[in-house]
């Protein structure tokens, strides 16, 4: 695939309460030996994305330990590699990531130094299976600047947990709001 991958794994979720007191949500155990980030990593590997950056922040120690061996996903350095980035305090930047857009912004040099023409951004705390090749094919066919994978939220009271989209009849995004208190729309971004 002609894309580089970024997995956002730095957030905390107050709904997880005690479960996230000592570990990042992306490091939460799933079915025994797996962690929630393994699903995004497997999706990247199965889509033949060979260069992946994981952006960590909150309670990242156990996540970093889990990621220290990339052999499970075959992100060898010769083909690309698995990179783990934490917020870095510099003269220009004295803050932790101030959200997902800022996490991407603070790591723009990684993207600028890459040769892949496309970027796949995924969440590290979602459990799903997705072929990013199909998403990229759709993206190219639509000649889109950005493609957001979305679904309908069955419970309108739950939209406050997601990014909410309003799209036109051509499936072009006309409005996007991250975690609104209330929304008349129920199309939400996933991953």
Listing of model-derived features with the role each one plays in the protein:
Residues 1-191:
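Unchanged
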């Amino acid at each position: 695939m002609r894309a580089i991958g970024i997995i956002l794994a730095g957030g905390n979720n107050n709904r997880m309460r005690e479960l996230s007191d000592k570990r990042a949500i992306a490091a939460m155990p799933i079915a025994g030996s797996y962690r929630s980030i393994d699903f995004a990593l497997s999706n990247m590997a199965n889509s033949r994305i060979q260069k992946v950056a994981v952006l960590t922040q909150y309670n990242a120690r156990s996540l970093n330990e889990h990621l220290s061996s990339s052999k499970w996903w075959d992100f060898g350095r010769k083909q690309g590699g698995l990179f783990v980035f934490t917020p870095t305090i510099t003269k220009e930047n004295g803050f932790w990531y101030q959200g997902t857009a800022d996490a991407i912004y603070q790591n723009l040099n990684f993207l600028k130094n890459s040769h892949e023409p496309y970027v796949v951004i995924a969440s590290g705390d979602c459990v799903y299976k997705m072929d990013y090749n199909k998403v990229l094919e759709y993206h190219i066919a639509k000649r889109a600047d950005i493609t957001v994978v979305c679904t309908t939220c069955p419970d309108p009271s739950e939209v406050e947990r997601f990014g909410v989209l309003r799209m036109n009849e051509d499936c072009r995004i006309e409005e996007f709001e991250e975690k609104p208190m209330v929304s008349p729309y129920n199309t939400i971004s996933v991953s």
